[in-house]
Amino acid sequence: MREYTAIFICILICNVFICPKSFGQTDYTYKKGKSFKSTNALSMTDTIDLTSISSPIPYKKSIPGQTQTIACPVRLPGYVRGIFFSRDSRPGDFEWPNNTNRLLPWVFNDLKELTDTRYPGIPSNATPSTLGDALLLELTNGEYLFAKAVAGRNSLSWLQVNDNGSVTLYVSTLGKDYLKPEVPLLLIRQGKDIYSTIRQAYQALMKNTEAADLKSRTAKEYFEAFRYLGWCTWEHYHDDINESKIINDMKTIEASGIPIRYVLIDDGHLAHKNRQLTGFIPDKQRFPSGWKKIMSYKKENKIKWIGLWYSLSGYWMGLSPENGFPQVVRQALYPHAGSLLPGTDSTRIRSFYRYYVSTLKEQGFDFLKVDNQAFTLPLYMGGHESIRQATDCNRSLEAEIHRQNMGLMNCMAQNVINTDHTSYSNSTRVSIDYKKYDEDMAKSHLFQSYTNTLLLGQTVWPDHDMFHSCDTVCG
C-alpha cells in the first residue's frame, strides 16, 4: 500500500510541477491576419523601470524553464509627448513582425491615443499597430528617453501599448523553443537632446555582439555606384518587364545624355511557382537570352553598373519545393510551413547565400536590391530556433555580399533582426513607397523618411525611395 501511495504522490507532483508548463504553448506559425497582441506569456512581477536606467541593454535573468514568452510591465517617466514606432494594422492584413517598409512614426501626447479608433491614421494606410519596435519620449524634465526592442541569440522583444496607455515588454522565441534563463530586454538611453540620445544608444548597441552585428555608417564602405544617378524599372513598369523593354530603355538612356550610371532591374524577372522561387535564372519567356544581351550594354563611361532585385528568402513566399537548384544546395534547405527555407544550422544557411550571391555575380550583376527582408522571420516562425535562423540569413547575406565585393540595397527590412544586422551594407529603405500627385502622402512620406533616419541613419544611409521631377506636389 505504501508503494502505491508513493507512486500516486509522484504522479501528483509530476502533474503539478511538470505538466502545466507544457499547457498553453503558443503556436507562433505566421499567417496573414494573425495578430500577436497580448500573446500568451508568463507574466513577470518585477517592473522594467525606465525612470532609473542602470544599463543601456538590461537583461532578464532567472527565467523559469520551459517558458516560450515572458511579459514585463514597463514603468515610464513623466512625459510631454512622444513617438511610437510600429507598422500600421488592419483586420486580415499582415501584422508585426512583418514590418516591411512600414516602421511608421506615430505621434502622441498620451500613449492611449494610439488605441483610440479616432486616431488619424497615415493617408491611404491603416491605424497604428500597438505592437512596435521603439519608443521616443520628450520628458517633463526636458530630457529625452529612447527605448528600442532587441534580439538575443534566439529571442526577440517588442513593445505593446495597452488600452490604458501603459506599456508591456514581451520577449519570446516565436517558436517551439524555450527562452534561455537570461535574455536581453531592450536598448535604453536618456539624454538632453534627441540626436545625441539616439546616437549614444546605438553606440551601445554596436558593442553588444549578442544583440546586434552593426557598424556606424561612417565606418563602412559606400558602394560606388550609389554615388551616381541611377534608373530603376519599377516605377515605370512595375513587374511588367522583359528583355526588349530594358534594352530599349538602356539605349534611350545612353542617347539622352542624362548621366545615369547604373540600372536596377526590379521585380518581374524571377522564375517562380506560386510566388516561391524555382531558381536563380530569369523567366525564360521574358528573358530568352538570360542576362547576356543586357549585360553587353554596360560601358565604363555610360551605364557602368547593373543591379538586380531579389527577395532575402528567394521570392515573396520563400523557395519552391519544385526548384532547379543543384543537389548540394537542396541539401541546405528544409521544409517548414509550406515553404523551403535555408537551414537548419548556420553552415547550411551560409552555403545557400554563398550560392545565391555567387550565381548572380557570375551572371554579371554588380549589386543586389534584396527586398522582403522583414518577411524572412515570419517564414521561420513556429519552428525551432526561428529567430536564430532568420538572423543567420541576414548575417550570411551580408558576409557573402562583402566577400564577393558586391553592393547591397536593403528593402522592406524594418524589423529588428534586419535593422540590427547590417554589418557591411550601407543603404536601407526608410520609407514606404512614394506616391505621385498626393499632398497628404507626400507629407507622410517625408515625415516617415526623416524620422526613421534618426534610428536607421545611425548605421546606414537612408534610402527615401524616390521623388519625381514631374510631381507637381513634391517634385
Predicted regions and their residues:
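Preference for well-ordered, secondary-structure-rich cores of eukaryotic proteins
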Residues: 97, 103-170, 272-287, 291-297, ...
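Glycan-recognition surfaces
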Residues: 318-351, 355-361, 398-475
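Bacterial Sec-dependent N-terminal signal peptides
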Residues: 1-26
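Functionally engaged cysteine thiol sites
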Residues: 87-88, 240, 409-413
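Aromatic-lined carbohydrate-binding/catalytic grooves of carbohydrate-active enzymes
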Residues: 224-387
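Short boundary motifs at domain starts and secondary-structure transition points
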Residues: 213-224
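Alpha-helix-loop-beta-strand connector modules within alpha/beta enzyme cores
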Residues: 294-298, 389-408
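N-terminal accessory beta-strand-rich subdomains and adjacent acidic, glycine-rich linkers
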Residues: 26-208
